[in-house]
From Swiss-Prot:
It is found in: Cytoplasm. Its main location: cytoplasm. Disulfide bonds: none annotated. Homotetramer. Forms heterodimers with either ThiH or ThiS. Its EC number is 2.8.1.10. This is Thiazole synthase. InterPro entries: Aldolase_TIM, Thiazole_synthase_ThiG, ThiG. The active site is at K98. GO terms for cellular component: cytoplasm. It comes from Anaeromyxobacter dehalogenans (strain 2CP-C). Catalyzes the rearrangement of 1-deoxy-D-xylulose 5-phosphate (DXP) to produce the thiazole phosphate moiety of thiamine. Sulfur is provided by the thiocarboxylate moiety of the carrier protein ThiS. In vitro, sulfur can be provided by H(2)S. SUPFAM superfamilies: ThiG-like.
Length: 257
């Protein structure tokens, strides 16, 4: 049986979501997206140049069959984020939206108050809202109560590559909310993606870790393997951590005793 997961009315098999920014060129982006095996690709609505057509358009280089996830990157108020989400729907990108309301330009940490405000409005308008948020369990619960279809806590600041700085809070979030938890931002390498999945994340979203790698296509393959391996480890169930050793072979019945 396929290990599927869903958000709202949308079901997926791949647990890796990818972005479209920071690639050296569109052909490299296209090859990396295909190599990732991802089914969902996020696009910054405010950064789309709608005047470009054909091969000059970013959208033309996204592999066929990938689900577009418009995001509200570069929005610093709830009002901006709401307008941008509406624009994405007008451009026929669907009802899914990765909601971002940025509170600080240097760290790109979310404005929690604005995020919750925007989420409530968009949920009422029929959007399936996936909010990029901090790693605070209280905020995650408020976003769930606001009607969000998932929560997307950061592992570390966007583009930092620092990995999961607070895995304990992420685990608490997973225990606190009933909606899917996707780790978003901060992943630097495949082991970070694997750890997120081992903690119990439903999926992982990343962009910079692949796009700015020395070999984006190879890194996309590595991230795919990391996510798949981490998911299998979570399902298999790791052994408990112990302070002292536990011999793999029994001590009774040894030869010469």
């Amino acid at each position: 049986m396929a290990d599927t997961w869903s958000i709202g009315a949308h079901a997926f098999t791949s647990r890796l979501l990818v972005g479209t920014g920071k690639y050296p060129d569109f052909p490299t982006m296209q090859r990396a997206l295909a190599a990732s095996g991802a089914e969902v690709v996020t696009v910054a609505v405010r950064r789309l140049d709608l005047s470009k057509k054909g091969e000059e358009s970013l959208l033309a280089w996204i592999p066929k069959g990938m689900k577009l996830l418009p995001n509200t990157a570069a929005c610093f108020t709830a009002e901006e984020a709401i307008r941008t989400a509406r624009l994405g729907r007008e451009l026929e990108m669907g009802d899914l939206v990765k909601l971002e309301v940025i509170g600080d330009r240097r760290t790109l940490f979310p404005d929690v108050e604005g995020l919750i405000q925007a989420a409530k409005v968009l949920v009422k308008e029929g959007f399936t809202v996936l909010p990029y948020t901090n790693d605070d369990p209280v905020t995650a619960k408020k976003l769930e109560d606001a009607g969000c279809a998932a929560v997307m806590p950061l592992g570390a600041p966007i583009g930092s590559g620092l990995g999961l700085r607070n895995p304990y809070n992420l685990r608490i979030i997973m225990e606190t909310v009933q909606v899917p938890v996707l780790v978003d931002a901060g992943v630097g390498t495949a082991s970070d993606a694997a750890l997120a999945m081992e903690l119990g994340a439903v999926a992982v979203l990343m962009n910079t870790a692949i796009a700015e790698a020395k070999d984006p296509v190879l890194m996309a393959e590595a991230m795919r393997a990391g996510v798949e391996g981490g998911r299998k480890a979570f399902l298999a169930g790791r052994i408990p951590m112990k302070l002292h050793a536990a011999a793999s072979s029994p001590m009774s019945g040894l030869i010469g005793t």
